[in-house]
């Protein structure tokens, strides 16, 4: 079996990636936020130039799939894409309510300053997947489990304290609103100058640290980050509402409606959307099958990539299979259905990993997609084997 092709870059708006159903164009909203007008425009672009769906990524980006090469220039004309390739900043989506003005919240202010610095002519040239995290709220870290190479995050010394921390280091140095962005750029420049970027143009901070690199004294410290927040689930949170979608995919018209209902929306790295909502809107969401508003929905227990035929590297269809498996996955567990060994939808281990191969699905417990594909004990699966393999004897729940 030929191994999957590992790309060192993500399909940004100006540099799309070809897939089985056309180009994949990734949009990085500034501060992971969209006004109602911006969301409606993006939805219209997805309907006009793509397949009519918007896919949410685990980097709080939005993918438009099915774009024809000949219409890609028209899509770019509809987007403000000139600087998005250099803006890879993940922002805490939950607004803290002890700040009077959301626009003056330190998450927004610091992310804006960081984006401006990255757009400067003298900014360091970073690998395509290299990213920043801005995670400041209430002495907690909403993004503690989300990937980021350079992190500006709440400290454990007090709810107003922030630290700058290189991913892979257990502690960081205290920073302020005024100094954080500049020091983050200095850390990025140190990463490049100290050999963090390989000959192939790739590089991640955690790997650099694991190889023995250490930030200089001015970019390191002994302050620990704040404790992680409770893992996010669909439903009310922080004065707003988190809404999920099966496999992180939402129809364009529903995306636009959600933004209009909330006034604006935050794209999260949890493949959910966060927005302000009243009781009437939440009630409408509950009765619309396009939205997932309950944390008990079985579809939240499965993760699946695009699969075949949308992805040329996938050996088989994935999402219909994931819908079949969802009712049998035990509560509290996660099943990862991957079209190939790359495991794009869920890079880490899952309680149940099922990976498509030319011979069929192969599975392993507490494994990555690659481990499931390669494990000696992996077994060929079809939908009729799932109940036994998952060791879940209760009647399936309605998905």
For each predicted feature, which ranges?
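Cofactor-/ligand-binding subdomain signature composed of acidic, glycine-rich
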Residues: 235-237
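Intrinsically disordered, low-complexity polar/charged tails and linkers
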Residues: 1-16, 230-231
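An acidic, glycine-/histidine-flanked metal-binding catalytic module
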Residues: 153-229, 266-267, 360-362, 371-374, ...
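Short Fe-S-cluster ligation motifs
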Residues: 336-349, 363-396
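Residues that cap or delimit alpha-helices
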Residues: 68, 210-214, 382
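Short, low-complexity, intrinsically disordered N-terminal peptides in bacterial proteins
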Residues: 1-8, 391-399
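Small-residue-enriched alpha-helical segments and adjacent helix-cap loops
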Residues: 2-3, 19-165, 170, 174, ...
């Amino acid at each position: 079996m030929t191994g999957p092709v590992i790309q060192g870059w993500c399909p940004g708006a100006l540099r799309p990636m070809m897939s089985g159903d056309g180009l994949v164009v990734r949009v990085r909203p500034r501060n992971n936020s969209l006004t109602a007008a911006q969301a409606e425009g993006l939805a219209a672009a997805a309907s006009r130039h793509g397949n009519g769906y918007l896919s949410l990524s685990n980097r709080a980006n939005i993918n438009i799939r099915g774009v024809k090469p000949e219409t890609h220039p028209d899509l770019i004309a509809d987007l403000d894409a000139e600087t998005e390739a250099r803006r890879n900043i993940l922002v805490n989506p939950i607004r803290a309510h002890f700040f009077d003005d959301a626009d003056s919240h330190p998450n927004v202010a610091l992310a804006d300053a960081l984006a401006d610095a990255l757009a400067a002519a003298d900014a360091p040239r970073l690998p395509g997947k290299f990213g920043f995290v801005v995670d400041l709220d209430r002495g907690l870290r909403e993004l503690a489990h989300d990937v980021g190479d350079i992190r500006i995050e709440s400290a454990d010394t007090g709810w107003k304290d922030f630290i700058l921390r290189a991913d892979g280091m257990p502690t960081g140095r205290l920073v302020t609103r005024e100094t954080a962005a500049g020091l983050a750029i200095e850390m990025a420049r140190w990463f490049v100058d100290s050999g963090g970027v390989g000959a192939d143009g790739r590089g991640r901070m955690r790997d650099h640290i694991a190889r023995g690199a250490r930030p200089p004294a001015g970019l390191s410290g002994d302050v620990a980050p704040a404790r992680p927040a409770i893992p996010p689930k669909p439903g009310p949170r922080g004065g707003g509402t988190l809404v999920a979608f099966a496999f992180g995919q939402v129809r364009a018209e529903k995306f636009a409606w959600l933004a209009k209902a909330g006034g604006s929306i935050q794209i999260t790295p949890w493949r959910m959307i966060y927005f302000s909502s009243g009781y009437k809107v939440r009630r409408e969401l509950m009765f619309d099958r396009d939205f997932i508003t309950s944390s008990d929905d079985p579809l939240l227990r499965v993760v699946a990539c695009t699969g075949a035929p949308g992805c040329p590297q996938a050996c088989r269809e994935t999402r219909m299979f994931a819908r079949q498996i969802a009712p049998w996955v035990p509560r509290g567990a996660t099943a990862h259905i991957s079209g190939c060994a790359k495991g794009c939808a869920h890079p880490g281990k899952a309680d149940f990993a099922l990976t498509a191969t030319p011979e069929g699905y192969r599975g392993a417990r507490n494994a990555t997609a690659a481990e499931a594909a390669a494990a000696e004990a992996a077994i060929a699966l079809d939908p009729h084997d799932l109940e036994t393999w998952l060791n879940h004897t209760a009647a399936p729940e309605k998905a």
